[in-house]
Each structure stands twice: as structure tokens, then as C-alpha cells.
From Swiss-Prot:
<protein>
    <recommendedName>
        <fullName>Uncharacterized lipoprotein YceB</fullName>
    </recommendedName>
</protein>
<keyword id="KW-0449">Lipoprotein</keyword>
<feature type="lipid moiety-binding region" description="N-palmitoyl cysteine">
    <location>
        <position position="19"/>
    </location>
</feature>
<keyword id="KW-1003">Cell membrane</keyword>
<keyword id="KW-0564">Palmitate</keyword>
<feature type="signal peptide">
    <location>
        <begin position="1"/>
        <end position="18"/>
    </location>
</feature>
<dbReference type="InterPro" id="IPR010835">
    <property type="entry name" value="DUF1439"/>
</dbReference>
<dbReference type="GO" id="GO:0005886">
    <property type="term" value="C:plasma membrane"/>
</dbReference>
<dbReference type="Pfam" id="PF07273">
    <property type="entry name" value="DUF1439"/>
</dbReference>
<keyword id="KW-0732">Signal</keyword>
<feature type="lipid moiety-binding region" description="S-diacylglycerol cysteine">
    <location>
        <position position="19"/>
    </location>
</feature>
<keyword id="KW-0472">Membrane</keyword>
Length: 186
């Protein structure tokens, strides 16, 4: 009798796991990070020419999905800056922490990071902190514009069977700690 109940429970759990794959597709932090690696070396000129401007190159982007704040993605990364200001030319490095709202675009089959904003930035050398505070609004706008146009992740029809189904049947996204779930049903 116990063997029968165990076998029945095993079959039911196997069916539930199998059915779960038919009702949703999950994208992990690791997959998002691999996709974000394509955004490494994002470069942009920002600031007020002649007053304070910088050429910025973004590297080492990594994500944390839904861990710090529900329904948000937190990105960390480095930025190399070549800055020109009234004080002359300087080089600096920054550690950035960004937050964004993941949004699914069904037409493109892509996840975009909207409402991108710098929530923390530390600069080395520290004496550049004041100049960086001047440039921060420009950096925020440049990153927001870039990530509004460039998807963080694109579903591929030639990918796995689940990914192809997600591209065709997606009904939006759900942000869970460590993953983004794309349900196929409402």
C-alpha cells in the first residue's frame, strides 16, 4: 500500500513539474547576466561641454532580480570615466548601483529595464565626487535612454522549446527573487 501511494505521489509530482513547463518559462539571473554582458562597454559622452563632461564606459554589469526590492531589478557595475572640467582632465572609476523595472514587450519578445536610475555611485579618486554629482543627472538620463531602447533579454524562437513557446504565448512577466517568470496563461 505504501509503495502504491509513493508511486502515485511520484507520478503526480512529475506531472505537475511537466505541466509547469507548459504554463510558464523562467529566466534566471545567470541568463540575464549573460545577456547583460552584451551591454558591457556601453559608452557615452555626458555632461555640459566646457563645464563638466565625461566619456563613460560601463563594464561588469550583473543583476539581482527581485531580491532587494519586489518587482525591481538591481544592477551593479563599474564605470570608467575620462572627465574634463574647469579643473582639467581626470580619470576616475565608479562603482554603480542601479534599479529598474523589468517590462515585457510582447511584440519584440523582449524584456526591457525601464525607469533605470542610479541609486548609489562611489568614485575613485574621492576628490572627484563633487564633479560626479554634477554629472549624475546626465548619467541617469543616458542610462535610462539606452535601456529603454536596448533589451536586457530577448526571447529566441530558435532557442529552447520553452523559450519559443514563451515568445509566442507570453502574457507578461512576474518578478520573483532570482528569476523572471513568463506565464503563458492569465
Amino acid at each position: 500500500m505504501n509503495k502504491f501511494l509513493f508511486a502515485a505521489a511520484l507520478i503526480v509530482s512529475g506531472l505537475l513539474v511537466g505541466c509547469n513547463q507548459l504554463t510558464q518559462y523562467t529566466i534566471t539571473e545567470q541568463e540575464i547576466n549573460q545577456s547583460l554582458a552584451k551591454h558591457n562597454n556601453f559608452s557615452k559622452d555626458i555632461g555640459l561641454p566646457g563645464v563638466a563632461d565625461a566619456h563613460i564606459v560601463l563594464t561588469n554589469l550583473t543583476s539581482q532580480i527581485g531580491r532587494e526590492e519586489p518587482n525591481k531589478v538591481t544592477l551593479t557595475g563599474d564605470a570608467n570615466l575620462d572627465m574634463n572640467s574647469l579643473f582639467g582632465s581626470q580619470k576616475a572609476t565608479m562603482k554603480l548601483k542601479l534599479k529598474a523595472l523589468p517590462v515585457f514587450d510582447k511584440e519584440k519578445g523582449a524584456i526591457f529595464l525601464k525607469e533605470m536610475e542610479v541609486v548609489d555611485a562611489t568614485v575613485q579618486p574621492e576628490k572627484m565626487q563633487t564633479v560626479m554629482q554634477t554629472l549624475l543627472p546626465y548619467l541617469n538620463q543616458a542610462l535610462r535612454n539606452y535601456f529603454n531602447q536596448q533589451p536586457a533579454y530577448v526571447l529566441r524562437e530558435d532557442g529552447s522549446q520553452g523559450e519559443a513557446m514563451a515568445k509566442k504565448l507570453a502574457k507578461g512577466i512576474e518578478v520573483k527573487p532570482g528569476e523572471i517568470v513568463i506565464p503563458f496563461t492569465d
